[in-house]
Structures are given as C-alpha cells and as structure tokens.
Amino acid sequence: MTHFSQQDNFSVAARVLGALFYYAPESAEAAPLVAVLTRDGWETQWPLPEASLAPLVTAFQTQSEETHAQAWQRLFVGPWALPSPPWGSVWLDRESVLFGDSTLALRQWMREKGIQFEMKQNEPEDHFGSLLLMAAWLAENGRQTECEELLAWHLFPWSTRFLDVFIEKAEHPFYRALGELARLTLAQWQSQLLIPVAVKPLFR
C-alpha cells in the first residue's frame, strides 16, 4: 500500500502552503517563499499540471497598493473580524468559537498518537497553516498513516469551505492566488487519499 504522502513533493508542498498561511510574509519562514512565488519557475516544481498553474503564475506577480504584510494582517490577525478565519473550530463548532469541540478532538488525537507540535503562544492547534505544517512533519518522519488521518479527519472536512471564502474575500492578488493554489493542491491530495474524509456539518 503506497501513501501519496510518501512522495517527496507532498511534504514540500505542504510545508510551503503551511508556512505561507501561518507566518507573516516578511518573517524568516515565509519571506523566501514569497520571493519564489513572485518569480517565474516555481510552477515547474509544483506537484500539479503546469497548465492549471499558469494563471496563478501571473496572479502571484500582480502588484497591489496593499502590501503583502498589510494583507496578511487583515486576513489573519485583525483588528477587524477576519473575512475567513483559519481555525477549524470556527467552521465546525455550532458557536463558531476558537478552542471548540473539534479543537479538543484534534488534541485528543494528537495525544493518542504521541504527536507534540509547537504552536505560537496560546493559539489553537487547528489553524489551517499549522495543520499543513504538521502533515509535512508527519510525512517527513515516515508517519504516513497519521498524516492521512490528520488530513481526512481534521483538515479536509472544513478546508474546502474555508478556502472558498478565503479566495472570495482575499482582495489581494497574492493571497487570492495562494488560496487557489491551496484549493487545487488539497483537491489533488484528497483524490488520492486511501481513507474516507470525515463528513462533518459546517456552521458558516
């Protein structure tokens, strides 16, 4: 049985997407990735057909009056309400709260699997970016079954809706393109999963 997450390009793509959603664009983790995506050539290395990526190459390079840092602040930090909150429990919990039941279920799963993952201070573990970084770490450490459980049970049940809203409301060419790249890539991964994706009701 071969897991798609055993492929080298899985962990690279998961780490790139995770870092760009989780870290500020000027951070040491994300700045080199922003530089790569705003130049030609990255699409030849991405694990999707180049034809499907061609519009994104142009979009990533499109200029905007709003800087990348300003857009990231608006989309992921605030102070105003975030247009598409990146935490799973906001979508999966009836009250749309942080640290909801779905976050607790993720924590329980992590404990059962012996997974320790360092988060920013007092932030829920179910951030879209951190879940991708965790998936990359699991894949890199040969834990393919846990990687695919994480995706099927704790990310894919809400990520499509999150990305649809994120793309619709991003209002910045780089982050709209990033949302599109994530949506295409996660759809490809989901089509290759060996276990079914959990069906969970969404509340926004």
Swiss-Prot record:
Keywords (A to Z) from UniProt: Chaperone
Gene Ontology BP term (one): chaperone-mediated protein folding
Signal peptide start and end residues: none
Pfam families according to UniProt: Nitrate_red_del
Record has Chaperone as a keyword: yes
Gene3D superfamilies (alphabetical): TorD-like
Function: Required for biogenesis/assembly of DMSO reductase, but not for the interaction of the DmsA signal peptide with the Tat system. May be part of a chaperone cascade complex that facilitates a folding-maturation pathway for the substrate protein.
NCBIfam families in the record: PRK11621.1
HAMAP family cross-referenced by the UniProt entry: DmsD_chaperone (MF_00940)
Name the UniProt record assigns to this protein: Tat proofreading chaperone DmsD
Organism: Escherichia coli O6:H1 (strain CFT073 / ATCC 700928 / UPEC)
Gene designation: dmsD
